Structure formats: structure tokens, C-alpha cells
């Protein structure tokens, strides 16, 4: 009687895969114009999620909670109450700066 012992081997080695190795792209949030900085109308002051900093005088809020300047002027960050912050833009007399 003929008995055959037949063993089949894989022709490619099995390679384990990692469950890591991916990450989301950074959103580049944060303050873009600092306190005392001159900004033009439309310039972004803060990119944020939620209203960590609230819009103050002459500052608008976009649909993604981005704060932007409505007029040309100087940015001022202010504290309102105990735990609230706001960003405002105040107009600057250009002739006073030139002198």
C-alpha cells in the first residue's frame, strides 16, 4: 500500500498588518492676530471650535466660529467677567501713527 504524506506550503509569507499608522490632518486652529496688532477688515483674528473667545466690538463670527475683523484697526483681547474672553478691533487714527 502506498501512503503519500502531502504537505502544501504557502508561496507567500503571511505579513501582519499594523492597526496604527494613521492620523487626521491638523486643523491649524488658534490665535492668528495677537493683542495690539494692526489688522485689515476681513483678516482672521482667531480660528476656533466653539466660542472659546467671543466676538467683541467690530468683530464678526463665521459659521465655523472663526473671528474676523470688520474694520481696519488694532486687535484687543479683553476679559468679560470671570471666565469669558472677547476679541475687539478698535479703529486707529492713521495720521497719529505717521507722526
From Swiss-Prot:
Q: Does the keyword DNA-binding apply?
A: no
Q: How is it modified after translation?
A: The N-terminus is cleaved by ribosomal processing cysteine protease Prp.
Q: Which GO terms describe its molecular function?
A: structural constituent of ribosome
Q: Which PROSITE patterns match?
A: RIBOSOMAL_L27
Instruction: Name the domain of life this protein comes from.
Output: Bacteria
Keywords of this entry: Ribonucleoprotein, Ribosomal protein
Q: Which Pfam families match?
A: Ribosomal_L27
Is Iron one of the keywords?
A: no
Give the family per the record. Answer: Belongs to the bacterial ribosomal protein bL27 family.
The protein's name is: Large ribosomal subunit protein bL27
Species source reads Clostridium botulinum (strain Alaska E43 / Type E3)
The beginning of the lineage is:
Bacteria, Bacillati, Bacillota, Clostridia, Eubacteriales
Amino acid at each position: 500500500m502506498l501512503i503519500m504524506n502531502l504537505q502544501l506550503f504557502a508561496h507567500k509569507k503571511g505579513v501582519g498588518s499594523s492597526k496604527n499608522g494613521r492620523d487626521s490632518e491638523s486643523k491649524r486652529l488658534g490665535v492668528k492676530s495677537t493683542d495690539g496688532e494692526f489688522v485689515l477688515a476681513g483678516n482672521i483674528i482667531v480660528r476656533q471650535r466653539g466660542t472659546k473667545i467671543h466676538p467683541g466690538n467690530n468683530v464678526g463670527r463665521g459659521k465655523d466660529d472663526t473671528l474676523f475683523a470688520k474694520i481696519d484697526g488694532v486687535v484687543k483681547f479683553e476679559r468679560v467677567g470671570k471666565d469669558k474672553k472677547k476679541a475687539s478691533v478698535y479703529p486707529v487714527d492713521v495720521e497719529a501713527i505717521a507722526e
